[in-house]
Amino acid sequence: MGDWEFLEKLLDQVQEHSTSIGKIWLMVLFIFRILILGLAGESVWGDEQSDFICNTEQPGCTNVCYDKAFPISHVRYWVLQFLFVSTPTLFYLGHVIYLSRREEKLKQKESELRALDDKEQVEQAIAIIEKKKMKLYIQEDGTVKIKGALMCTYLTSVIFKSLFEAGFLLGQWYLYGFVMTPIYVCERVPCPHKVDCFVSRPMEKTIFIVFMLVVSLISLFLNVLELIHLVCKSMIDTLKKYSPYVPPNRYPKNEDTYPEKTSETATAPFQDKSYIYLPMNDNISYPQYKMPNEQNWANFNTEHQLAISGNNQSPLGHYSLSAFVPVPPKTHSTMEKPSTRASSSASKKQYV
């Protein structure tokens, strides 16, 4: 059982670098093959040769009939099947370990280069190392991306697993069949005539044979399904690689995000210009602030009142403030215009 535990640890490492279908295949391999075969196989098939009895007393007849009925024990046959089916996965694991060790060496070399002083040569060497690391397809979490040469190795392992499964199923059908008969008729030297041999617990052994047959069929189905998945994935990657690049659309395609255009036509000068409608909420509350010109005019009135109130105290009070008064906007009430005939006549007398 120690060798089986070592093999189980190796296959557990493969699970980290397999597809989802490959992980299901490993679960089927461990739970329904290793555990069932290790726990129930010996108890069911332990009396296979000891309880194989033939109705003859001819020496050696029972042994040759047992060898003809069971060229290889069922348990040993299933163990051999398990080893053959697991071997391609171990080759794939070896490729993964090789890529991981290679990445570790590249990282170590990169750290050594960063410690040097010549920046130009260091940058060139680091760029070369980065290109080599990209070819390894190893992600940041340590898992290997199945691409390139690793994809070929994985595809090859799946193909060989499928071939081994199908081959062992055909071999079991040719050697034993899938039903254990209670009586086996043997005619072989040194038996003097046809001999009837009896198998112990044939129904129990038939159930076990059918169970292992179903497990083998499930494993074969998963391998074929994974093979189709990998082929489709590689074809999609190839099409993406050689297809022209189409940049993503920066603007939304849904026309509902923009409000409908109003039926009213724009007035000049914006009538002939195109403009964008932006989505806005109808219930927007604006703060009650005054317009800038209204606020400036209110500030000026306040300062003007303060200046008039302090006119008597200021030494410059006898000067007129009309020179400093700005012209108010048209939207507000304007100051009274001093246009009288008396003032105009007085100005004429002054010039005379």
From Swiss-Prot:
Matching Pfam families, A to Z?
Answer: Connexin (PF00029)
Which residue spans traverse the membrane? 24-46, 77-99, 154-176, 209-231
Q: Which superkingdom does the taxonomy of this entry point to? A: Eukaryota
**Stretches assigned to the Cytoplasmic side:** 2-23, 100-153, 232-352
> What is the membrane topology noted in the UniProt record heading this document?
Multi-pass membrane protein
Recorded hits in SUPFAM superfamilies, A to Z, give:
Connexin43
**Which sequence ranges are listed under topological domain Extracellular?**
47-76, 177-208
User: Which key words are in the record?
Assistant: Cell junction, Cell membrane, Gap junction, Membrane, Transmembrane, Transmembrane helix
> What InterPro entries does the database record attribute to this sequence?
Connexin, Connexin_C, Connexin_CCC, Connexin_CS, Connexin_N, Connexin_N_sf
Per the UniProt entry, what are the Gene Ontology biological process annotations, in alphabetical order? cell communication
Instruction: Give the subcellular location.
Output: Cell membrane; Cell junction, Gap junction
Predominantly, its location class is membrane
Cellular component GO terms, alphabetical: connexin complex
Enumerate the residue ranges of region (Disordered).
Answer: 330-352
Key word Nucleotidyltransferase present:
no
**Composition bias type Polar residues, residue spans:** 340-352
Q: Does the keyword rRNA processing apply?
A: no
| Subunit and partners | A connexon is composed of a hexamer of connexins.
Q: Which family does it belong to?
A: Belongs to the connexin family. Alpha-type (group II) subfamily.
What is the stated purpose of this protein? One gap junction consists of a cluster of closely packed pairs of transmembrane channels, the connexons, through which materials of low MW diffuse from one cell to a neighboring cell.
Please report the name of this protein according to its UniProt entry.
Gap junction alpha-4 protein
Q: Which organism is it from?
A: Xenopus tropicalis (Western clawed frog)
Lineage, uppermost ranks: Eukaryota, Metazoa, Chordata, Craniata, Vertebrata
